[in-house]
């Protein structure tokens, strides 16, 4: 029985493929037929008018026989093409397809009869009562308020491998039109019914990764299935199935939010409530009424970065840089992108390179020279001595030259590089060190990030004769207390760290100094001015896509 149904399905597919080929062939033979008729007509016109022989003054009778042969050839070709076109038109396979099946199989609408899917499966799915083994299985429940014409139908070819409950009750057929799942909405407590052939086998299948058994909210008490009745709702692919389930999920979510008693029967996932008025939801609307939170007027220096970098605290600061206050709406997104850029571009490669250098040191017989254990002076000396063997050590030492406590710095760099977006970052403190809390003798996370950011740009900017140490960016664009920037110079454009603990940063631009702000907002203002005022150029280096590639964090703003 199963092999016979499979052969039927294969013959159906072969027929549709043949129809597609014949539809394409009809267009070709019709075009050739019209072309041959046109050529034969032109030659016949010349034969009667004798235009060529008169114009070229040649003997007419030899030319007439040649033209007669060509006219006969083109006429025969035209007759043959029209005969093939008539054959394809009149002897085309008579097959009935629904509009959705015609679209899925690529069969032209003119090549097949349009009919509801029930015409295809009426004779293949006889109605019968469910077997006892089907009792107790969860099946799809459906809304009683929906009309039968809007209920979905699923073919086994679309839901094979999905829900074990459904798969176990489907007939073992390879035909995509053998049986389907449908719903009933005759009364409120009723759910669905199922029809299967008497000899159909039951078999389990693995749960599909997409729908997860067609979602548990559509499962209900033991019930039965019936065959489909409407062609409009015949589902033919997984995308339509997923769209339907998502829409029903949203409807159920709205119903549950409007339910006065979540424990009542009407509020359970099995049932759907669409008949309530707006007044029935008044108590819920009052309960979930939206209320504005109060803003903090003066961020405390002891609070975390989230408070200090709030939108309210940054309004006046950004107002001095740009008049567009709508930019503040993008501040959180810019900050997240910038943190991710620092992590992926600087922190993670730096930690990996440090581990690589430590491994090379051990291979060279210098296990005592390990980054995170040796002093910064020993590392600088080793960078000079081992430069031919480990050329990257000199670059790494510049990133580490911020604190004498190299062990804490190395461990903190590894902690900050974890999580993808520096999730352990603390703007006014750092991490624990050897079981004790962070103290002021250790650098803050803000100081570490600022240092590695400046060092990275030092490596990207070309060397300058005024700064033989190679710190071009740091010397020109970063001033740390107790030093102060020259505000009388209009060309000064730098970041000023006005306080160490807690760390405060100010942006100096065109003789103006912004109010204190957190690290990331100050760096964002610095980069935003470069993008909007300096055309993305920091000196001779492009910070855009063709250079450092950091200005992408602002998008099109």
From Swiss-Prot:
The chain crosses the membrane at residues 28-48, 60-80. This is Transmembrane protein 209. Glycans are attached at residues 57, 273, 343. One of its GO terms (cellular component) is nuclear envelope. The keyword Electron transport does not apply. InterPro entries: Cytochrome_B561-rel. Residues 108-156, 194-232 are annotated as: Disordered. Keywords: Cytoplasm, Glycoprotein, Golgi apparatus, Membrane, Nucleus, Transmembrane, Transmembrane helix. It is a multi-pass membrane protein. It holds the Pfam family CytochromB561_N. Residues 125-140 have a biased composition (Polar residues). It is found in: Membrane; Nucleus envelope; Golgi apparatus; Cytoplasm. Residues 141-156, 194-205, 219-228 have a biased composition (Low complexity).
